[in-house]
């Protein structure tokens, strides 16, 4: 079993060439995602609150939630994907849960999270 773990770590270390910021659940982030339209490539910025983190290592994913025109939009991003060009932390929040799925049932001011200043 140890040789399998070492082999997995070796493969993951070769493919995870990104240095990621310290992301936590509750942070408001802006992601730059590369989108190809025909033969053009552009970077689209998406912004939202991280409501969950899943997996580890090279398979690390985050779920981002944002409400646009009264409709909640959630998207899952693979953090070590080559399509993800930039990650910027806009705001850190003080939370006491590992998953913020309860934000799905709230609306308006109830979705605000208390800001952390450290």
From Swiss-Prot:
Q: Which domain of life is it from?
A: Eukaryota
GO terms for cellular component: chloroplast; mitochondrial large ribosomal subunit
Q: What keywords appear on the UniProt entry?
A: Chloroplast, Plastid, Ribonucleoprotein, Ribosomal protein
Report the PROSITE patterns cross-referenced here: RIBOSOMAL_L19
* Species of the source: Guillardia theta
Q: Which GO terms describe its biological process?
A: translation
The record, for PANTHER family, names:
LARGE RIBOSOMAL SUBUNIT PROTEIN BL19M, RIBOSOMAL PROTEIN L19
Q: Name one GO molecular function term.
A: structural constituent of ribosome
Location of this chain's protein in the cell: Plastid, Chloroplast
Q: Which family does it belong to?
A: Belongs to the bacterial ribosomal protein bL19 family.
Supply the SUPFAM superfamilies for this chain. Answer: Translation proteins SH3-like domain (SSF50104)
| Pfam families (alphabetical) | Ribosomal_L19
Q: Answer whether the UniProt record assigns the keyword DNA damage to this protein.
A: no
* Identification of the protein by name: Large ribosomal subunit protein bL19c
């Amino acid at each position: 079993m140890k040789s399998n773990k070492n082999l997995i770590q070796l493969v993951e270390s070769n493919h995870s060439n990104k240095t990621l910021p310290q992301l936590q659940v509750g942070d408001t982030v802006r992601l730059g995602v590369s989108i190809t339209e025909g033969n053009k490539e552009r970077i689209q910025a998406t912004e939202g609150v991280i409501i969950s983190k899943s997996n580890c290592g090279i398979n690390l994913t985050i779920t981002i939630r944002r409400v646009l025109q009264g409709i909640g939009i959630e998207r899952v991003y693979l953090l070590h994907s080559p399509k993800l060009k930039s990650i910027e932390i806009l705001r850190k929040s003080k939370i006491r849960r590992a998953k913020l799925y309860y934000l799905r049932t709230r609306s308006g001011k109830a979705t605000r999270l208390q800001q952390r200043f450290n």
